[in-house]
């Protein structure tokens, strides 16, 4: 049956409703987006397909579609190309190109590109190190995100950076409040996101938070395990009425974490790979009935 724009758009909607897309679903999704790109020349579809390839770590193809959209002056494509070159996804990092694309996007109000541009000033990538410039940019983004409700708004990324600035300035109370908000935003985002970088963000937020406040097991949530599972312990977890035991321990001088008869080398591998009923553990955040330390 020949594709139409309406049918192709329906394929996209149906694909995003799938819990576990199969190979055939992926092919149909790709074909639909390629059709929409050909028929509409809409850069939004180009970035959408580029983003899918990026998530699959097929970075060469992601770059191709981002460049296609950038030629149409699509601001989100500039941001995405900044990531490609900043992290060296298609070779070595190219900070000159990264700065170029982040600057293009930032100048058009893209907040993600703005905080990445700030990072380049902080680290001295392509530009001279300029920490005051970094602080100025990050602080300027804070009012733009106050009142944000979309879990994919860059609240965790900006607030966690601003929290570190406040710690340096001696304002730990404000830093703690920012980290608590960032943690809740990122926890909610992970219910819906399978992007490989989102777990790294929540990990650093949790560790930064517990460098400022004392951990209290009575108020523990799922992502506090990034802090708890760094040393030997035993926990009980209930998700949707089913009990699980999580244990971090040493055996023959080797540290590992176990849950549901599976072992993990460290807390990063645990969060990346632990599954419950074929769903990632981290996506079960809202289904946790209780989580407690055991003796």
Can you describe what each PLM-predicted range is?
Residues 116-119, 149-166, 190-213:
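TPR/TPR-like alpha-solenoid helical repeat scaffolds
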């Amino acid at each position: 049956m020949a594709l139409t724009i309406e049918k192709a758009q329906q394929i996209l909607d149906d694909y995003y409703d799938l819990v576990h897309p199969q190979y055939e679903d992926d092919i149909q999704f790709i074909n639909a987006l390629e059709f929409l790109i050909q028929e509409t020349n809409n850069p939004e579809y180009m970035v959408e397909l580029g983003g899918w390839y990026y998530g699959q770590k097929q970075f060469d193809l992601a770059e191709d579609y981002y460049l296609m959209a950038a030629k149409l002056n699509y601001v989100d494509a500039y941001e995405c190309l900044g990531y490609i070159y900043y992290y060296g996804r298609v070779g070595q990092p190219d900070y000159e190109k990264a700065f170029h694309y982040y600057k293009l996007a930032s100048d058009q109000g893209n907040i993600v590109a703005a905080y990445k541009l700030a990072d380049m000033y902080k680290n001295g990538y392509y530009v001279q190190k300029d920490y005051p410039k970094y602080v100025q940019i990050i602080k300027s983004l804070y009012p733009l995100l106050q009142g944000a409700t979309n879990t994919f708004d860059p609240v965790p990324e900006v607030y966690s950076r601003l929290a570190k600035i406040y710690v340096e300035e001696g304002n730990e109370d404000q830093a703690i409040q920012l980290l608590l908000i960032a943690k809740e935003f990122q926890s909610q985002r992970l219910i819906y996101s399978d992007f490989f970088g989102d777990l790294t963000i929540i990990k650093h937020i949790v560790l930064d938070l517990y460098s400022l406040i004392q951990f209290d097991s009575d108020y523990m949530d799922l992502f506090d395990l990034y802090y708890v599972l760094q040393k030997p312990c035993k926990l009980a977890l209930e998700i949707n009425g089913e009990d699980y035991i999580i244990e971090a321990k040493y055996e023959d001088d080797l540290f590992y974490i176990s849950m549901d008869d599976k072992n993990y080398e460290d807390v990063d591998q645990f969060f990346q790979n632990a599954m419950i009923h074929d769903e990632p553990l981290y996506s079960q955040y809202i289904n946790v009935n209780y989580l407690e330390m055991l003796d």
